[in-house]
Structure formats: C-alpha cells, structure tokens
Amino acid sequence: MNRDNTIAWAVDDLCVNYDHSDVLCHIAFSLPSGAMAAIIGPNGAGKSTLLKASLGLIRASSGQSLFFGQKFAKVHQRIAYMPQRASVDWDFPMTVLDLVLMGCYGYKGMWNRISTGDRREAMNILERVGLADFANRQIGKLSGGQQQRAFLARSLMQKADLYLMDELFSAIDMASYRMVVDVLQDLKKEGKTIVVIHHDLSNVRQLFDHVILLNKHLVCSGSVEKCLTKEAIFQAYGCELELLDYTLKLSRGKYQGSC
C-alpha cells in the first residue's frame, strides 16, 4: 500500500462481514490530500461501514486503511470524524459549547483542563457556524440543521487535516446548507481533505471534486467526470437508475455515455 504522506486516505482490499453476509468486498482506493470527496451509493451500499471500518470502530474481516501513510492510531489527532446525526443521543445533558470543546480532547487529552483560550476559540468557531447565541443550550434543543452545525463546529475544534463526515447535509435547512458549504470551501482553501457521505446526486458536481462510488464493492473512485457517468451510476444503483434520471440531468445537464 502507498505510504506517501500526500495520500490522505488509502484503503487496500478492505472487506467487512456481518453475520456471514458481505457488507463491503475488496475495497481499494487512494484519496489525495486536499481532495473534497463524496462517498455515494444506494442505501445499504456500505458507505458508513467504510468510514467506521477504516477508523477501527467496527472490525474488518480483511484489508487495511492508512491515513497519511500511517495506521489511524498513529495519526488520530489529524483526523476528525463526524457521525450520523441519527446515531447521537440528543438527550445527553450537554450544552453546545461542551460539545464543541470535546474537539480539544484529541490534542489536549481527556484529563487536561480546558483553558480560557480553548473556550474563546470554541466560541469563535460557534460564531463561524452561526451558533454563538446557542452556546449554553442543551444539544437536543437545537433544530436538525443546528445540530449538524454543532457537530461541524466540534470537528473544526479538532484542527484536523482530514475530515470524515457521515451525512453532513442530512436534514438541514437552506441557511444551514449555505453556511456548511462556506465552511467546507474555506477548509478546502486551507488545504484540508474532506470526505462526506452524500445522497443528493444533483449537487455532487457543484460541491465535490472527487467521488467514491460504492455498492458493497467499489464501482469507481476518481474525479467527478470519471465517476458520475450513466454506466457507473447504473452499476451502483441498478434498477433505481430511472429514479435518479432527473437528479443526474440537473447535475450535468445530460448523461455522459450510454448503456
């Protein structure tokens, strides 16, 4: 496997099985540093599983993942992971500011005191995502879009080089959408690498420069032009293709290639 530090994320022959059933089969790709990538594919394609297995949150049956040429444990401080909103316990007694300050733990450690400077930085980040006025609100009292922005703020507090975000754009309003896009574009300009599990094919071309297209196996990894074709989408989505016709036409104006 490539150990070049210019490769932010490299996956080699990764397989995951649940109850003797294949969830991911022989996934292999490399993502260059500075890319802004969408992981796309139908429901059940293994998109979230790919992130979790790569981070060691679930066990892979074979293969491995490297980040910046190293195992995750060696470079975890350089990686920020944002889970699916649905997986979070929103009743947990934690304020928005507390959530953002959790982003310090990767580089400060769990038991080091949070400083006044840390709190000031967290408030600046909350201002950046439009949540400064909600700093002392319990996280479950936020709207869906605000909750996504709060977790994005926690990721920003980590000062990472690679951001892995599971369904970042899920259940957000237009104001949150625009704010999130602005933040991602700023991160891109800073040379950060961004990976988002994404479902709306109509805006992939506008938001991303790289695609990882899955359906339990890797269909395509590379530029949007390479992967967002009728052939590749049909391979991944199969009989769902007709349902995607309108969104793909919005994305490109027309299909590229033919079946």
UniProtKB/Swiss-Prot annotation:
Q: How does it sit in the membrane?
A: Peripheral membrane protein
Q: Which UniProt keywords apply?
A: ATP-binding, Cell inner membrane, Cell membrane, Membrane, Nucleotide-binding, Transport
Q: What positions does the entry give for ATP binding?
A: 41-48
Q: What residue stretches are annotated with the ABC transporter domain?
A: 9-241
- The organism's superkingdom is given as Bacteria
A matching Pfam family: ABC_tran
Checking CDD domains in the record gives: ABC_Metallic_Cations (cd03235)
Location relative to the cell? Cell inner membrane
Q: Which GO terms describe its molecular function?
A: ATP binding; ATP hydrolysis activity
Identify one Gene Ontology CC term for this UniProt entry.
plasma membrane
* Disulphide bridges, residue numbers: none
Principal localization?
A: membrane
User: Family assignment?
Assistant: Belongs to the ABC transporter superfamily.
Q: Which PANTHER family match?
A: IRON TRANSPORT SYSTEM ATP-BINDING PROTEIN HI_0361-RELATED, METAL TRANSPORT SYSTEM ATP-BINDING PROTEIN TM_0124-RELATED
* Job of this protein: Part of an ATP-driven transport system TC_0338/TC_0339/TC_0341/TC_0342 for a metal. Probably responsible for energy coupling to the transport system.
**What is the name of this protein?**
Probable metal transport system ATP-binding protein TC_0339
Record organism: Chlamydia muridarum (strain MoPn / Nigg)
